[in-house]
Design a protein with these regions (language model features):
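Claisen-condensing/thiolase-fold acyl-transfer catalytic domains that form or cleave C-C bonds
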Residues: 1, 107-191
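Short coil/turn connectors at secondary-structure junctions
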Residues: 2-6, 27-30, 37-40, 99-100, ...
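Short beta-strand segments
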Residues: 6-12, 34-35, 106, 176-179
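Acyl-CoA/ACP chain-elongation machinery
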Residues: 9-10, 53-67, 108-114, 144
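Condensing-enzyme catalytic core mediating Claisen C-C bond formation in acyl metabolism
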Residues: 15, 20-80, 183-191
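Cysteine-centered functional microenvironments
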Residues: 19-23, 68-74, 101, 136-149, ...
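Phosphate/pyrophosphate-binding loops at sites that engage ATP/ADP/AMP, CoA/4′-phosphopantetheine
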Residues: 83-101, 161-167
Length: 191
């Protein structure tokens, strides 16, 4: 039914063992969004690029309450997936970094998104780079307070940007990178 609204909920708990490298990144929470055919706040621009591979960088074995992770490898996979889907998105749409007013990321920890942003900024002039960095800082404020939400972290970043940035305008294009270890990645835009 195209006139219906849908409630989308992303909830998870990121729990790691005591004194493990992942302990400092753990968190828990949920993000809920109302999606409709006639949005009042943001709309999907249409089209995305995505990548999926079977990669054992992060997993929770059956019967275990805590995840296992190869942190450095997982970080490298994240950046590889971002570079792949972002590059493919630019090729597909003809956009450059100049077409985005902000880039938002899945944030297992906030430095990870900064690393991906720096990858994207390799093609940016100083003014665009400064704008994107400023908006990234606005987008990661809540993630720094809450910790890793897993499935909800990208949308917590979006909420943080919208609530903490005062210079975005209606119709500004936001680029979003969604990611999940194991691994899947998607890049899409919202207006």
């Amino acid at each position: 039914n195209p006139d219906s609204k849908a409630l989308i909920i992303g909830a998870d708990i990121a729990k790691y063992g005591l004194n493990t490298p992942g302990e400092v990144t753990q968190g828990g929470g949920a993000v809920a969004m109302l999606v409709s055919a006639n949005p009042k706040l943001l709309s999907f621009e249409g089209g995305s690029t995505y990548l999926s591979r079977n990669i054992m960088d992060f997993w929770r074995p059956l019967g275990h309450s805590e995840a296992l992770v190869d942190g450095k490898y997982s970080s490298n996979v994240y950046l590889d997936f971002f570079n792949n889907v972002y590059s493919n998105y630019k090729d597909k749409t003809g956009f450059t970094i100049d077409n985005f007013e902000a880039l938002l990321f899945h944030l297992p920890y906030t430095k990870m998104g900064l690393k991906a942003l720096r990858e994207a900024q390799k093609d940016a002039d100083a003014k665009v780079s400064a704008k994107l960095t400023h908006r990234f800082e606005d987008s990661r404020l809540y993630n720094r307070q809450v910790g890793n939400l897993y499935t909800g972290s990208l949308y917590l970043s979006l909420l943080s940007l919208l609530e903490n940035n005062d210079d975005l305008k209606s119709g500004d294009r936001l680029g979003l990178f969604s990611y999940g270890s194991g691994a899947q990645g998607e890049f899409f835009a919202m207006l």
